[in-house]
Amino acid sequence: MGQKINPIGFRLGINRTWDSRWFADNAEYGQLLHEDLKMRKFVMSELKQAGISKVVIERPHKKCRVTIHSARPGLIIGRKGADIDKLRKKLSDMTNSETHLNIVEVRKPEVDATLVAQSIAQQLERRVAFRRAMKRAVQSAMRLGAEGIKITCAGRLGGAEIARTEWYREGRVPLHTLRADIDYGTAEAETAFGICGIKVWIFKGEILEHDPMASERRAMEGDAQGPASRDRDRDRDRRRDNA
């Protein structure tokens, strides 16, 4: 099952938590869920160039708090905060409630699965060779502390007549290990030959404590590296200095 299921959904309540955090009765639940989907779709399409990793939605009493994790927060905020005020007003109109916006910077986009997938998709749309784009992403992730990464690209790669799937993997990606901190992201590249799908799995180390917020807390602290990867980087630097 670990090979088939979404790795984030598989670990919910263990070391991952939900992106929508609110409670509602049966009468309101469907409406609020569709509001969340609508807001996420709007933010991802409106701020495509800002490198959106994820959108977390919380609903305190009769209010809405939206946290946007972005690789380029400056593009969202705009000059003197003008753009973020416009975005806040649009989201308030969608929810018919007071909306608060928080922008969180993703310090290492090279080890964020969603941003890696989006980057590869943009390169494929610019006609960059898919193998080169995948290899470059793998090397960048491993260099910046990932313990393992796997990337698959599916579709009419390189304009081939028959669609196929190509993949690269480096390091460990233990999908069955529930304590493993595995980030997963997808993206679609709209090429001249059709749509290509990209999937990315990134293994960032193990989380030993049973804490649904552990993965998010690690990301917020900018500690995307696990202890094993830090030791490996230290040994690599020591060997380079001795050479």
Swiss-Prot record:
Annotated segments matching region Disordered: 214-243
Keywords: Ribonucleoprotein, Ribosomal protein, RNA-binding, rRNA-binding
GO CC term (a single one): cytosolic small ribosomal subunit
Biased composition (Basic and acidic residues): 229-243
SUPFAM superfamilies assigned to the protein according to its UniProt record, in alphabetical order: Prokaryotic type KH domain (KH-domain type II), Ribosomal protein S3 C-terminal domain
Matches recorded under InterPro entries: KH_dom (IPR004087), KH_dom-like_a/b (IPR015946), KH_dom_type_2 (IPR004044), KH_sf_prok-type (IPR009019), Ribosomal_S3_C_sf (IPR036419), Ribosomal_uS3_bac-typ (IPR005704), Ribosomal_uS3_C (IPR001351), Ribosomal_uS3_CS (IPR018280)
UniProt xrefs under PROSITE patterns: KH_TYPE_2, RIBOSOMAL_S3
One GO term of the biological process aspect: translation
GO molecular function: mRNA binding; rRNA binding; structural constituent of ribosome
Quaternary organization: Part of the 30S ribosomal subunit. Forms a tight complex with proteins S10 and S14.
Function: Binds the lower part of the 30S subunit head. Binds mRNA in the 70S ribosome, positioning it for translation.
Annotated family: Belongs to the universal ribosomal protein uS3 family.
Family annotation (HAMAP family): Ribosomal_uS3_B
Protein name listed in UniProt: Small ribosomal subunit protein uS3
Naturally occurring in which organism (per UniProt): Rhizobium leguminosarum bv. trifolii (strain WSM2304)
Gene: rpsC
